[in-house]
Regions:
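N-terminal active-site segment of His-dependent metallophosphoesterases
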Residues: 1-65, 71, 138-152, 337
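Conserved beta-strand elements of the Class I
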Residues: 5, 118-120, 238
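Active-site neighborhood of phospho(di)ester-bond hydrolases with catalytic His/Asp-centered motifs
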Residues: 6-8, 42-47, 73-81, 85, ...
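Metal-dependent catalytic neighborhoods of phosphoester/phosphodiester hydrolases
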Residues: 15-18, 46-66, 83-100, 167-173, ...
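Accessory, non-catalytic peripheral segments of nucleic-acid enzymes
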Residues: 36, 223-337
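Short, conserved loop/helix-junction motifs that constitute active-site signature segments
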Residues: 66-71, 147-149, 176-182, 251-252
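Conserved catalytic scaffold of divalent metal-dependent phosphoesterases
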Residues: 75, 82-177
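Conserved beta-sheet core of the metallophosphoesterase superfamily
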Residues: 162, 167-231
């Protein structure tokens, strides 16, 4: 018996110790996963990486992932994090996978056959296609296209349904319900949580942010008869809060990740909790406290390290990928530290 197995967005990353640890935990699990056999076929919904411009470590993650795969074929629906235009040139993080004869990635709409099942791949794209249409314009009308409106056993996409997104957003596709009516199964990546529509969105393989905790993540599995079931995934990571110096809350995750409240620096947190994975430290008792609330404990002030605090701030900022800005700001702080 051969199965078609689907995994949601993976987001391999090394921009923090906890992201490295989660990536490592996933790779270790994947290598021994019982579905990872040469009888089965794997589909990935995209976003294998968190950032398209790769470090050496993430390149290593991608190579280890493909080296440990025993699947007969691996099919990837390209996501928005996988492909970027850098210096005017399209860059795909795992373009070197093209050298593998049993690995296929799809950067444009594609009809393929996997284990005798008809599959329509709808990858994410920015700008316009060769018809001058945006992703929203093109995919939203597929249900009435003479060619693509034909029945498929499976449709895999990397975008958001208009029912659960902002009006006019570039990652939004309309009429997904009509695609569902015309096809056997629609599976969407891109959205990391499943609670909005667990029958449509597979969700990411693990929580990439603190508001994405979910102990019920799953792979989707279709057997040769076309029947579907879910296979629960391990909890690769979990985001938790602890108020310094209280005991750490329990977690069954492979990588528990802590926000330490009432603590001004990672150095102080580690003096209490040792070698844990820290998302950030917060000087007050609430990460979202009001600007007027500036109270912190006396213990939290001791040993305050401005450079360490800056690094923590930068990791959680919207500009954390701007290496040049980080270097300039940190050098200025080093002169004053």
């Amino acid at each position: 018996m051969s199965n078609i197995v689907i995994l949601g967005d993976i987001h391999l990353a090394d921009t923090s110790e906890y992201k490295r640890a989660t990536s490592e935990a996933f790779l270790d699990w994947f290598a021994s996963w019982e579905q990872n056999t040469n009888d089965n076929y794997l589909i990935l919904t995209g976003d294998l990486v968190d950032i398209c411009l790769l470090t050496g470590r993430v390149t290593d993650y991608l190579e280890r992932f493909i080296a440990s795969s025993r699947f007969k074929e691996l099919h990837i629906c390209v996501g928005n994090h996988d492909k970027k235009k850098i210096l005017g040139i399209d860059q795909l993080a795992y373009e070197f996978y093209a050298r593998k004869t049993n690995v296929h990635y799809y950067s444009e709409i594609s009809e393929i056959s996997i284990n005798g099942k008809s599959v329509l791949m709808l990858p994410y794209y920015l700008g316009t296609n060769d018809q001058g249409l945006t992703m929203t314009e093109y995919y939203s009308q597929l249900y009435k296209d003479p060619h693509y409106s034909q029945y498929h056993d499976l449709v895999v996409g990397h975008f958001c349904d208009d029912e659960f997104s902002f009006s006019g957003a570039s990652d939004t596709v309309l009429n997904v319900d009509k695609l569902q009516e015309k096809n056997g199964k629609v599976c969407l990546g891109h959205i990391h949580t499943r609670n909005i529509n667990p029958g449509l969105f597979i969700g990411s393989t693990w929580a990439c942010k603190k508001n994405e905790n979910d102990p019920n993540r799953a792979a989707w599995v279709m057997d040769e008869s076309g029947c579907w079931h879910e296979e629960k995934l391990p909890v690769f990571c979990e985001y938790l809060e602890v108020s310094y110096p209280d005991p750490l809350p329990e977690s069954k995750a492979m990588v528990p990740i802590y926000t330490v409240l009432n603590c001004a620096s990672e150095q102080i947190a580690r003096s209490q909790y040792g070698d844990i994975y820290i998302r950030k430290t917060v000087a007050g008792e609430n990460e979202h406290r009001s600007k007027q609330d500036t109270s912190i404990s006396v213990d939290s002030v001791k040993g305050f390290d401005i450079l360490e605090y800056f690094d923590t701030f930068w990791e959680t900022s919207d500009v954390k990928d701007n290496k040049e800005a980080y270097t300039l700001c940190r050098q200025a702080l080093e002169k004053r530290a």
